[in-house]
Amino acid sequence: LALAADMAGCALIGRPLVEGTGSLANFRVQAKNLGTDLMGAYLAAAQELVQRLDTFTFPQKERPELLVLHASSHHTSNTMALWAGVRERLGEVCSVQEIGLRNGTLDDCSGCPYTMCIHFGEKGECFYGGVMSREVYPAVRRADGVVILCPNYNDALSANLTAFINRLTALFRQTRFYDKALFALVVSGYSGSDLVA
């Protein structure tokens, strides 16, 4: 549905849905935080979404900052070859910062206890530190848009890009991403030998 809407020219605001299971059990934490029952938490989330939809205007910046994340080699990657063409066409329309998340530079989330994740997240950090805390979190905060360069490995993201997404949880505790545009450049190949985007 999101892809069809995007292809039709729609822009989706950050967190554009309120998702409730049949029992609304996925609203337990929100209900506790709000001092209400499950239905009250669900309705509060829906009301907050309606307010954001009602007041949303697409941000206009003269020269937006774009963060580009990848986990590929510039020398051998079809994904990076396609990005080079896109980057060239962007010209000076935006400021671009690229961060490579290659093997060995990014540890995946190992599932800290909820309270520990909140503790570090409120400081804008993550227990596991590394490139995420030093480079990626500050870059995500500054960026107006994020581009994820994704080779398609058996209909899935690479491990490093999956780790990046998993580790965003700590940053989300402090920074909502509602004002950021998200783009993906996905490249599939036939055993890595042909470029199909």
Where on the chain are the PLM-derived regions?
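FMN-binding flavodoxin-like domain, especially the glycine-rich phosphate-binding loop
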Residues: 1-97, 129-131, 135-142, 148-150, ...
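Cysteine-cluster motifs in flexible loop/terminal segments that predominantly coordinate metals
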Residues: 98, 104-137
